[in-house]
Design a protein with these regions (language model features):
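Single conserved hydrophobic/aromatic residue that forms the stacking wall/gate
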Residues: 158-169
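Metabolite-binding pocket within alpha/beta catalytic cores that recognizes anionic/polar moieties
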Residues: 1-127
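Short Gly/charged-rich anion-binding patches and loops
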Residues: 66-69, 134, 138, 164
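Active-site rim beta-loop-alpha module in soluble metabolic enzymes
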Residues: 130-160
Length: 169
């Protein structure tokens, strides 16, 4: 059975939808990560607040490697993550879901890999299709079933290594 984790971004801070929630601090080789573990319809789900349980960690200080490693330690096999973003596409309306299938990461201030030669050696990872198509299909089908507007393709551009938001340009 696959174990699912949700990583909540700005606006998604807690696992209130889960029952029998317990909080755990997971110690990883990269630091600590705080997780909430609970149940939804009998299935164990892990919730991790990207900005911390009290939303006190700004974007440029998030310990992504500790967070992902903690989920691995908890035997999570699938991750769904939310993020608060703006869009240049006027077809996207507030409240609609854009299920990105590509991304460009232009940030430079964080270590974005486990394969930098220090921890796991050096590896080259194919990022042609960086997201799990099976999980994407499940989300698309659930959206259709529940009449949620989902745009099945999109590219997310990460540019800011700080809490700064976009400009009008």
């Amino acid at each position: 059975m696959n174990k699912l984790a949700f990583i909540g971004g700005t606006g998604v801070y807690d696992a209130g939808i889960l029952s029998d929630i317990r909080s755990e601090i997971i110690n990883t080789p990269f630091g600590q990560a705080a997780c909430q573990i609970g149940y939804f319809k009998g299935k164990e789900i892990v919730f991790l607040a990207r900005h911390g349980t009290e939303h006190t960690i700004p974007p440029h200080k998030i310990n992504y490697r500790a967070n992902i490693y903690a989920l691995k330690m908890l035997e999570v096999s699938s991750i769904v993550s939310t993020t608060a973003v703006g869009s240049l596409n006027t077809e996207y309306k507030p409240g609609e879901l854009v299920l990105i299938d590509q991304f460009l990461d232009m940030t430079k201030s964080r270590n974005g890999t486990f394969f930098d030669g220090e921890f796991r050696g050096v590896a080259h990872i194919d990022m042609t299709n960086p997201y799990c198509q099976t999980l994407r299909n499940v989300i698309i089908q659930a959206g259709m079933k529940n009449e949620i507007a989902i745009h099945p393709n999109g590219c997310l551009l990460y540019t800011s290594p700080s809490p700064r938001d976009r400009t009008r340009s």
